[in-house]
């Protein structure tokens, strides 16, 4: 027997209602803010992610699914959604239709990580990209969209953490101070931090091992230039005026190299070690880095699997998927075709119908309808058809009535609405 690959999941049954709930909410919220959906390939040229995410990041060094295709090209399953979206923006000359461009995506991503609750090797993200605006209004909008989305899911136990990691000028001075701070601690830090000290010093602040050194490290907000400081203050002021709750975290840097300026993360209080449910920020230099014109941009992404865990942890009721509303059972050769016609009439009126396609007696059909959690059962029998009626049965209470053929749709709809 074949089994699914480690770190992947089969999504079906009762779980599907959570996926529909989150994806439908994401589409509705992005609609309210004028975002259009984009769907990019799940695999791209490896160099796209090396250039964008950063050669020294954990994603590129340890986590990417990379292979050679039959043309000896290096291909990678996408580990995140921003780089493919920006590649599509450049390749398809989307700038020609005007800026800013608002895009969103929902889809699977792939990273070779140690599977655990809320962390899979194939996982799914919802994300937005706001391309073409350098205004603090854009930074605030991204955070507001994220906040409205989470509130629309019914979540309350989450915290938005924000910071500014400044521009290249700010970071140059800050990196010097950070190197000075860690210079006498190199023999004490973890192996990853030893490597990052010379390749990407900011990533030391993201270390989950040497947290005692991180908390006492210099704060980048003390080294922001006037422009970056002004942008950060303007963004916070807008969020304050809109009553968006957030916490400042001067050690927040994010794990991808393309970020600059405003960055943010969202953590949920009931998810333990894997508390991050989303994050984002500015990437003003990414489009130029990937071959386009210098274009200020920003965005965020959220993990759908972790959002589902959060929704369940908070006990948020999620509407059942409205399928299997009616099971149509039939008895006798001459009743089959009429039962099919009745099923199609119900479907024409938006009622979900499961039609019996097996050679079963009535008791077996009713048992199957019960297993499917059908709310109602229509029984179409030869004897009833001779009298121009069918039987409508409530599967929960056992109540049943006879309905004249012409009133099947109306009465069935009434019974569904009453439940």
From Swiss-Prot:
Keyword Chloroplast: no
Gene Ontology cellular component list: cytoplasm
Entry's localization field: Cytoplasm
Catalysed reactions listed for this entry: tRNA(His) + L-histidine + ATP = L-histidyl-tRNA(His) + AMP + diphosphate + H(+)
GO biological process, one term: histidyl-tRNA aminoacylation
Main location: cytoplasm
One Pfam family from the record: HGTP_anticodon
PROSITE patterns, per database record: AA_TRNA_LIGASE_II
A Gene Ontology molecular function term of the record: ATP binding
Name of the molecule in the record: Histidine--tRNA ligase
Organism of origin: Thermosipho melanesiensis (strain DSM 12029 / CIP 104789 / BI429)
